[in-house]
Amino acid sequence: MPGGHYAHTVVADGLVFISGQLPINESGEPCTYLGFAEQTELAMKNVATALQAGQCDWRHVLKITAYITDVDNWPLFNKVYATYVGEFKPARTVVPVPALHFGALIEIEAIALRNGDSASR
């Protein structure tokens, strides 16, 4: 997980809050040279790692917020996103933005319930 002056995962009252995850590899290097689909894949993997740190997985996700720099990439985001969340359909917001840190094309944050808790959908 990348460094920074913040927590990537915070747990409070059974909720897991995951800070925005960028397409950064395990060595902490931004992978902004990748295309949108690959950046999305890497950001989603980072969210998955943060979920594990909070003792939960995709089944426990309540809300996803994705920031994308080009709305034309929205359908591609949907395609990659669906491979992670599967039949689970958390609440979701996609926010077009002019720019992201390191020149990334996407940043993803999440809120989840800790393992053992359940949510109705």
Range-by-range predicted roles:
Residues M1-R121:
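Short, polar/acidic, helix-capping and beta-turn segments at strand->helix junctions
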